[in-house]
Amino acid sequence: MKGLEEYVREILEDIRRRGLEALREYSERFDNYSGPFRVSEGEFEEAEELVPEEDKRVIEETMERLWEYHARQFRDVELYIKRGSLYGLIYRPIGRIGIYVPGGKPLPSTLMMVGIPARIAGVREIAVTTPPKDGKVNPYVLYVAKLLGIEEVYKLGGVGAIAAMAYGVGMRRVDKIFGPGNRFVNEAKRQVFGIVGIDSLAGPSEIAVIADESADKDYVLADLLSQLEHGKDSKAWLLTTSRELADYCSREGIEVLLCRNLEECAEKANEIAPEHLEIITENPEELVDLIENAGAIYLGPYTPVPAADYFLGVNHVLPTGGAARFSGVLTVMDFMKPITLARVSREEFLAYRRLGMRLAEIEGMEAHRRSLEVRR
């Protein structure tokens, strides 16, 4: 029996080699779909009619909140001047991105969370892929795409969608791929990295809650169970100083750690490096400085993960599987490329070139040394 890596590699290579013919075969095999891949203008119009007016208002207000939060992250230049010389960074948006929207449960919020910071960054071209169900794309996903000005939506799922975006099969290839998926999608993203950029390899959802005796036990339990709803591989931890709360939340799927004090709770949280960390204590702000590893920190009883997932305006694309030790939340800057900018004055060049000349000598780079020495 083939392992996941080999199985995905063979599909990717087949699509890269045979192009559309192979892509259509896999679409029929996995999605039972044999029609045109690109969503037509008529399908966008039909989808808009299918979304109730009340839901349209919910989506639009949610998107406004997301836009307000993410717009504050934008920056296009960071410069400083020293001795007449100019140094800094300029930021340029990625030219073309692909967004994978999972199809198991339609996730219009995924498209909002990725599409809005992309637009704020100035990304010019966005292609969306999502698995069709009965030959159609979820109308809520199409409505969000329309609001974002995205005209390219493709009925493609799984490894085939990643191959299409990375190799330019049935569409122009993208520069970077965003969006969560199952283990096949994750493995495909891992294998095409280097040909294109990727955001991250999203795993099962996670929540850790630090809570003390002041926490409402029903709030805490509801929050822990909310993340287990994502699937059987989801993880939930309760880190608490309260024996009563520990006993109340001891349910299947929840790992309870009874700690001596809140400092130990914070220490355990850093070891877990959870995707979401709620702190529901009498003074939650006092623990923030102790937290080093978490995708997001939500303070107090009225900042549950589902609120962040849907309406707070913060981004819910977060590192999982302990990746919060070395990566963080999706931001506008993930859609931009920092480029070094420098213009050095003659005065500063002549004052400091001796440093470069000596380093070039140490490294045996004579032509480098000469490039510095020749200037007068």
UniProtKB/Swiss-Prot annotation:
> Binding positions for Zn(2+)?
Q227, H230, D309, H368
Q: Would the keyword RNA-binding be found if you checked this record's keyword annotation?
A: no
Sequence positions that bind NAD(+) = Y100, N182
Q: Where is the active site?
A: E275, H276
Q: How is the cofactor bound?
A: Binds 1 zinc ion per subunit.
Per UniProt, the keywords (alphabetical) are: Amino-acid biosynthesis, Histidine biosynthesis, Metal-binding, NAD, Oxidoreductase, Zinc
Q: Which cofactor does it need?
A: Zn(2+)
Q: Which Pfam families match?
A: Histidinol_dh
Q: Name one GO biological process term.
A: L-histidine biosynthetic process
Could you tell me what reaction this enzyme catalyses? L-histidinol + 2 NAD(+) + H2O = L-histidine + 2 NADH + 3 H(+)
| UniProt-listed InterPro entries | Ald_DH/histidinol_DH, Histidinol_DH_CS, Hstdl_DH
A GO molecular function term, named singly, is: histidinol dehydrogenase activity
Enzyme Commission number: 1.1.1.23
> Can you tell which superkingdom this protein's organism belongs to?
Archaea
Q: Which GO terms describe its cellular component?
A: cytoplasm
Pathway(s) this gene product operates in, as recorded in its UniProt entry:
Amino-acid biosynthesis; L-histidine biosynthesis; L-histidine from 5-phospho-alpha-D-ribose 1-diphosphate: step 9/9
Residue positions annotated to bind substrate are S205, Q227, H230, H276, D309, E363, H368
Instruction: Name the PANTHER family on file.
Output: HISTIDINE BIOSYNTHESIS TRIFUNCTIONAL PROTEIN, HISTIDINOL DEHYDROGENASE HDH
Family to which this protein belongs: Belongs to the histidinol dehydrogenase family.
Q: What does this protein do?
A: Catalyzes the sequential NAD-dependent oxidations of L-histidinol to L-histidinaldehyde and then to L-histidine.
What name does UniProt use for this protein? Histidinol dehydrogenase
Q: Which organism is it from?
A: Thermococcus kodakarensis (strain ATCC BAA-918 / JCM 12380 / KOD1) (Pyrococcus kodakaraensis (strain KOD1))
Q: Which gene encodes it?
A: hisD
